[in-house]
Amino acid sequence: MAHRSVTPRTAGFNTLDMAGLTIPSLFVIMALMFVGASPGGTGGGVKTTTFGVTVLALWATVRGDREPTVFKRRIGLEVVFKAFLISFIAFLALNCAAIVTLMIEGRGLLETLFETTSALSTAGLSMGHSGSVLSLAGQFSPAGKLLVKVMMFVGRVGPLTVAIAFAARRERARLRYPEGRVLIG
């Protein structure tokens, strides 16, 4: 049974007919695919450590702590910011890709979300059609296939790396601005 939770994160072994699963099962699989593999591996997704840091930071915020801690070690704010940035960029890329794929291919929302999430995570899973066709993305138009390839590239290289490659670099100033108070919530 543990294999079923590892497959969406890294393996790419399509051991089940994904089109035959229930909607809640598909959403659990999509969540596992979004998180993806652990760092150092060849799988895509936002990575397990990024997800862990994000959850720990949210928990620390709820508890009123200044910094998240785990195993009697604090996690620096720079790491927390990177984890949130990676998660946000991946979520934004996933939603943009799903919307564009919906417009190009005209498939159902669930199938499109599943295919784009699978591409981002490089999991290799597909809802396909029951029967002889196993890959729904294999039936996409050339534009849809190109979008899947771009998502696979973003998922494998990493959302932050892709964002840094396109962002304008500027020299860091040695001064610090005074802290501003912003009302949240």
Task: List the predicted regions and their residue ranges.
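Membrane-proximal intracellular helices of multi-pass ion channels
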Residues: M1-G185
